[in-house]
Each structure stands twice: as structure tokens, then as C-alpha cells.
A protein has these predicted regions:
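Hydrophobic core of transmembrane alpha-helices in multi-pass small-molecule transporters
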Residues: 56-74, 182
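Helix-to-loop junctions at the C-terminal end of transmembrane segments
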Residues: 18-30
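Extracytoplasmic gate region of multi-pass secondary transporters
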Residues: 172-188
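C-terminal ends and interior cores of transmembrane alpha-helices
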Residues: 40-54
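Helix-loop-helix hairpin linking two adjacent transmembrane segments in secondary transporters
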Residues: 98-149
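Intracellular juxtamembrane helix-capping segments at the cytosolic ends
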Residues: 73-87
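Residue-level signature of mid-helix packing/kink "hotspots" within the transmembrane helices
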Residues: 12-20, 107-108
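Flexible cytoplasmic inter-helical loops of multi-pass small-molecule transporters
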Residues: 145-163
Length: 188
């Protein structure tokens, strides 16, 4: 379906564009603010798919724009950076590995649950259940706090977002990495 494909294209574009914004928000105000903000967009997108009109521009706004913005702050990058800041170097790898494993298990269970729910209850009720899951995540994100000063955690810099972008785009390996991901999206 063209409308669905276009919405997913918008979603992926918004995810990529808003990820750095949520990263800057997390650095400046704390991971919980970035994740809560993203969960609000994500939850509204799913909720409006459940309750609102779902044709034309509304579908593109709900499925593409709102959910895409929400993914920018709830997908793996922002939560992993928050987890990384909570642990000293000696235990950071194991902590991040556990979070990645739990997230991957969620990716494994989600299609199974979704398929079952769609067959048994239909798409509307399935969207309602996902709205409840996201509300749970929204409340859980409230309890994510910035870590207190830990001696073994390296000192963070006071670099601004603009300075960080400038430094990144002067680094050849970063430009190659971004180019690789950019090319990946041309199939959309």
C-alpha cells in the first residue's frame, strides 16, 4: 500500500532527524526528559491511530510524523546512552549488554503478540493495547534519573550541541558511517 509505505518512509526520516535532537536534550536536561518527551510523541501517534481518523494526511501524521519523532528518543540509542552514564567503565559493558538483550527479547516477542492480538481481537484493540504499553513506558521513564557523580565514570565535557556536530563532521569515519546509513534509506 502506497499510503503505508509513505508513512513508514516519513517515520524513518523523522526517527533519523530527531535522534540527535533527543540526544542533545538528554545531554542538557537528562535522559528522563528526552525519553519522556519521546514517549509522549510515540504514545500520541499510536493513540490517534486507535481513536482518530486514519486516512490521508491524518494517517501520515499519526503513523509517520508522531511515531517517527517518538522513535527518535525511545529507540536504542538514547536509552543506551542513559544506561552507559549510570555505570562505571568496569561494569558498563555488562549493563549495556543486559539492556540490549532485554530489548532484543522485546523485538522477538512483539511480532508474536501482535500477530496473536490481530487475529483474536483486530487491529483497533491491538492499537489500544500498544497505547497502554506505551503509557506504562512513559511512567517508567519518569523514574530514569541522571546519575550522581561516580568517581570511576569519566568526566563529561561542556561541549555544546553545535560544537559536537562541528567536531563530528570533521571526522572522516563519522562522515563515512553517516553516509552508509543514509544510503541504506534510499530503498524507502
Amino acid at each position: 500500500n502506497t499510503a503505508f509505505g509513505f508513512a513508514i518512509g516519513i517515520q524513518m526520516l523523522m526517527w533519523g532527524l530527531t535522534g540527535p535532537i533527543f540526544g542533545a536534550l538528554a545531554d542538557r536536561y537528562g535522559g528522563h526528559i528526552a525519553i519522556i518527551s519521546a514517549f509522549i510523541f510515540y504514545t500520541l501517534g499510536i493513540y490517534f491511530l486507535y481513536t482518530g481518523p486514519n486516512t490521508g494526511i491524518y494517517f501520515q501524521i499519526h503513523m509517520g510524523l508522531l511515531i517517527g519523532i517518538g522513535l527518535g528518543g525511545t529507540a536504542i540509542s538514547i536509552p543506551m546512552s542513559v544506561v552507559g552514564k549510570h555505570f562505571p567503565l568496569s561494569t558498563r559493558t555488562i549493563a549495556m549488554s543486559i539492556v540490549t538483550a532485554i530489548g532484543s527479547f522485546g523485538y522477538f516477542l512483539s511480532p508474536i503478540f501482535t500477530t496473536y492480538s490481530l487475529k483474536e481481537y483486530g487491529w483497533n484493540y491491538t492499537l489500544f493495547i500498544f497505547t497502554l504499553f506505551l503509557i506504562t513506558g512513559l511512567f517508567a521513564a519518569y523514574f530514569v534519573r541522571s546519575p550522581s557523580e561516580i568517581e570511576s565514570v569519566e568526566k563529561t565535557s561542556d561541549q555544546s550541541f553545535k560544537e559536537a556536530l562541528s567536531e563530528a563532521f570533521k571526522t572522516k569515519s563519522y562522515i563515512l558511517l553517516v553516509s552508509g546509513f543514509f544510503v541504506c534509506g534510499f530503498h524507502i
